[in-house]
């Protein structure tokens, strides 16, 4: 899943959706959902999974989803929606980002109805309770975005097999995750 709705050469896909830039995550909530980054990102992950499963080389009974940061956030949403995955690894991403973290001010600036609408549509807390796959959460104690308190609340939503790793002073990035 590309955060910018683009191809490997970074050019935009015709139906790639809006880019992940901050205004597209929070401030377009009053627009129709087809203008929302989260809507396109989740749909694109599920579409990509369907495509991969259609290949004869792929074992559709053993697919796994993992992504990092905003991708980990999306992994948490998709894990509750697409039950074909056999395992899920959410690195740095979790739910309840409206309760704590760097986006708190963004949510507080929203009207009550816009905030509630965003939570109902996109916060992983709305989906993790439906997760039917094994899920593994990976994070560090010093992550600036997905803080331990909301990480623990996300973990508690999972009814099935779950595990987590919380590494002391784990950096943020692809190599660390």
Annotated model-derived regions:
Residues 1-43, 97-106:
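Cap/lid segment of the alpha/beta-hydrolase catalytic domain
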Residues 1-2, 64-66, 87-90, 136-137, ...:
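Structural recognition of the beta-strand scaffold that forms the well-ordered cores
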Residues 5-8, 95-96, 142-144, 170-172:
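Solvent-exposed loop/turn segments at secondary-structure junctions
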Residues 46-117, 142:
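Primarily recognizes the serine-hydrolase "nucleophile elbow" in alpha/beta-hydrolase
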Residues 148-177:
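Catalytic cores of secreted or luminal carbohydrate-active enzymes
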């Amino acid at each position: 899943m590309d955060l910018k709705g683009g191809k490997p050469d970074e050019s935009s896909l015709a139906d790639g959706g809006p880019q992940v830039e901050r205004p597209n995550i929070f401030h377009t909530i009053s627009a129709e959902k087809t203008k929302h980054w989260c809507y396109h990102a989740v749909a694109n992950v599920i579409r990509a999974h369907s495509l991969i499963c259609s290949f004869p080389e792929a074992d559709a009974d053993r697919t796994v989803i993992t992504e990092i940061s905003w991708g980990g956030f999306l992994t948490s949403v998709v894990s509750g929606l697409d039950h074909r995955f056999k395992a899920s690894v959410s690195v740095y991403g979790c739910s309840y980002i409206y309760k704590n973290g760097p986006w708190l001010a963004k949510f507080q600036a929203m009207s009550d109805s816009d905030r509630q609408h965003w939570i109902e549509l996109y916060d992983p807390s709305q989906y993790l309770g439906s997760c039917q796959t094994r899920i593994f959460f990976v994070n560090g104690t010093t992550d600036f975005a997905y803080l331990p308190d909301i990480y623990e609340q996300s973990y508690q939503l999972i009814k099935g097999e779950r595990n987590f790793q919380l590494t002391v002073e784990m950096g943020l990035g692809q190599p660390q995750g």
